[in-house]
Amino acid sequence: MDGNDAPNAGQCPVMHGHAAGTGMRNHHWWPNQINLKVLHQHSSKSDPMGAQFNYAEAFKSLDLDALKADLTALMTDSQDWWPADYGHYGPLFIRMTWHAAGTYRTADGRGGGSTGNQRFAPLNSWPDNGNLDKARRLLWPIKKKYGDKISWADLLILTGNVALESMGFKTFGFAGGRPDIWEPEEDIYWGSEGEWLAPSDTANSRYSGARDLENPLAAVQMGLIYVNPEGPDGNPDIVASGHDVIETFGRMAMDEAETVALVAGGHTFGKAHGNGPASAVGPEPEAAPIEAMGLGWLSTHGSGKGADAITSGIEGAWKPHPTTWDMGYFKVLFKYDWELTKSPAGANIWLATNVEDEDMVEDAFDPSKKHRPMMTTADLSLRYHPKLLPHAKRFAEDPAAFADAFARAWFKLTHRDMGPRARYLGKEVPAEELIWQDPIPAGTQIDADDAAALKAQILASGLSVSDMVSTAWASASTFRGSDMRGGANGARIRLAPQKDWEVNEPAKLARVLGVLEGIQAGFSSGGKSVSMADLIVLAGCAGVEQAAKAGGHQIEVPFTSGRGDASAEQTDAESFAVMEPVMDGFRNYQARELSTSPEEMLVDRAQLLGLSAPEMTVLVAGLRVLGANHGGSAHGVLTNRPGVLSSDFLTNLLDMGTEWKPSGKGVYEGRDRASGAARWTATRVDLVFGSNSQLRALAERYAQDDAEASFVADFVAAWVKVMNADRFDLT
């Protein structure tokens, strides 16, 4: 063979050997090219459910009791192809659920169990998810039976609850409402390392300085959920491991008490698997041969399953009675001294010394055998790290407090990424309102006449188009589709910490809110009421309408009332602090230099807002000419008529009479090619709409002479989409 697939004379003229989508891709040739595909993932073309499918309605028809009964029966229905430890699949399913939800991180709200993403790469093949493919395969007959009434995302979470309940634990509750995705998530940054479990001193490490973990990451190594259980980089340093435990769980929204409860509660059940050489384990699912049918980590050690199973390489159970909820974990943790040794797979583990017979652990498959309790390095940090020890001692002495803390922390773990209670479905939703759910009081409705009257007052108040538009944008654009947090509902822009964020220009914000509060008070004195959340959005709509009218377009921006106003008591300021933007390309704001380019951060923000590339294009172009820039900056305000909704930004950006050159860090100056006279200044997030071929194509379309009305209409549609992004009551 010469490698040439061109047909020889007399042969079939059809080319063979190269399928669609293969070969070198654009990102291989130009690795710094921004990735706009993240704005168009999970489209209708990859979703088999159809546009009319409503998962919330389908879930309401689910017989939850029957489903839970089937799941309970599955727990002890051991299968020969993957037998259950101790005759009970509960611990396996708890790990499955934990690892589905545990990828969540607060910095960008991405990860977590709300999409069923554990079915897809890379998560389905992470080293830390070893053999969870077997857990999902065990669930398939039940998913097949209940079909569209239960998503994989909900099933992966519910199964963990049922597993706990089947072993004697009372859970805090369960909420459905997680629709499935049907393709891998391409927007999530999992790290830059080029190998699984790369140590912290490797190239492209996520660590810098004295072990400072890169944001937004919340795991210590590529392919792990949280920490390396053997210790940092596999080094069995107990106190250092405790630091990792605190940091990674903290980045997943857990405080130290919740962290201790989760570790101890989860390790009350089951065992770890490392009863053989790691070299016997086959490739992960995505790398497995086609005949493996999606299963990975197939082992040649003995039977490859049951007593011979190898998963993490750690071997052993934490306590006696691994399928029963009790206080055994804390009992053995504090009762015994621990000696460092190696598992059969070569992993660092700690075994209790001088163990009394009552604390020996029964073998998972042979009742004639018993083993000493095992702890990982991370487990022992609960006893030896000074910040974790007080919580561990308190729980060890108070079983009721431990059970309550674990129940609440487990519920938080499995529901933190669902957003507000308005998205919760089912009869097991807890009645108690929790601060981390970002509660918002019910709003009031105003009719069209009231809205018109209020807009007239706003327009007569002295507020500029820039004031109205920028304040509404600041309020609504906090929304994150990743974990459904933020948004205009609640009007938390009035409260700490948002009112003090630099990006929101606190002095200007206070002035605008003061004017709107006066209008609100006057309206309410008439026996009616309007929330500040609604009024802020309504003011933005009024500003857009006025700007469009100034450009010759008579429009009405759709507005739906019903937002409520959250109080300071309903707002966890610390949890909102992580949402403060250090970069917002829509407002041409950058607080500091980042390792990621400004244009990439613009795309990142657009993806969190659920925007497409065309929507991002019209919003940036419109917000520039409406004066939404941070601090009134002139960068990117490519118009001679600011305050008028027009496509001037795009028209002038594409003008070949302008030559752009760098004029400072991140700033560019546009000069007349012929005269050299200064015309404009702009940033990278402005110029990208002329430099990137895909964005330029969109810019050219909206800059056409016949596209002005289309631009205005599309800007309004994208604006309304952002204003209503958190209105789960409307869907």
Swiss-Prot record:
Give the record's keywords alphabetically: Heme, Hydrogen peroxide, Iron, Metal-binding, Oxidoreductase, Peroxidase, Plasmid
Which EC number(s) are documented for this chain? 1.11.1.21
Domain of life where this protein originates:
Bacteria
Q: Key word Heme present in the record?
A: yes
Task: Identify one Gene Ontology CC term for this UniProt entry.
Answer: cytosol
User: Annotated cross-link Tryptophyl-tyrosyl-methioninium (Trp-Tyr) (with M-252) - which positions?
Assistant: 98-226
Q: How does it assemble?
A: Homodimer or homotetramer.
> What role does it play?
Bifunctional enzyme with both catalase and broad-spectrum peroxidase activity.
Q: What is this protein called?
A: Catalase-peroxidase
What is the originating organism of this protein? Ruegeria pomeroyi (strain ATCC 700808 / DSM 15171 / DSS-3) (Silicibacter pomeroyi)
Q: Which gene encodes it?
A: katG
